Amino acid sequence: MEETKVIKVLLLSNQEVVVSEIEEVAAEFGDPNCRLTKPYKIEGGALHKWMQDYTEQNEVMINSDKIITLVTPSPMIFEQYSKVTS
């Protein structure tokens, strides 16, 4: 049975807006507890691979306290994200 992917738009504490598959993971207090898979920064209506200048990783761990809010992507953003990640 395939696990359902949870795709969300995240507003981070540094004001970046990122669309990503997100999963909460068990972690020790203070350790990163959210796994972002294939994160893309939304900038000017376009998607850019998040942290592309710094890494080739497709998975990034962050602390949930760095997420101000998360929402379901609009159909347009979801379609763009699906195209760039498939």
Identify the residue ranges that each predicted region occupies.
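Conserved RNA-binding domains used in RNP assembly and mRNA/RNA metabolism
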Residues: E2-S86
